[in-house]
UniProtKB/Swiss-Prot annotation:
Main localization category: secreted
Keywords: Disulfide bond, Knottin, Secreted, Signal, Toxin
Protein location: Secreted
Protein's name in the database: U1-lycotoxin-Ls1mm
Domain comment (free text): The presence of a 'disulfide through disulfide knot' structurally defines this protein as a knottin.
High-level lineage: Eukaryota, Metazoa, Ecdysozoa, Arthropoda, Chelicerata
Organism: Lycosa singoriensis (Wolf spider)
GO MF term (any one): toxin activity
InterPro entries per the UniProt record, alphabetical: Spider_toxin_CSTX_knottin (IPR019553), Spider_toxin_CSTX_Knottin_CS (IPR011142)
Family label: Belongs to the neurotoxin 19 (CSTX) family. 03 subfamily.
Signal peptide: 1-20
Residues making up the propeptide: 21-44
Amino acid sequence: MKFVLLFGVLLVTLFSYSSAEMLDDFDQADEDELLSLIEKEEARKDCIPKHHECTSNKHGCCRGHSFKYKCQCTTVVTQSGEETERCFCGTPPHHEAAELVVGFGKKIFG
């Protein structure tokens, strides 16, 4: 009987120790994931949304649903006759086509 009691206490001690370490690992993973999400959110706040001007920062466009927006530039003639370059963040046509095909595929195949 003493052997069974001693074995039971040892088993409970080992189980509680291992579960405590697992919980610590999960807590650390949760903290790391939270910090990663916060960093991504900060980067998102600094990016340029779709249809906004990106002339001064051509690589700062935000991400869309599937792809990152690209800075698309055009040459504009002002009223004084000067040609200036104006850029905006948008989805390139080949990305729009890919999103259309993926959306159509999701509707068909569920």
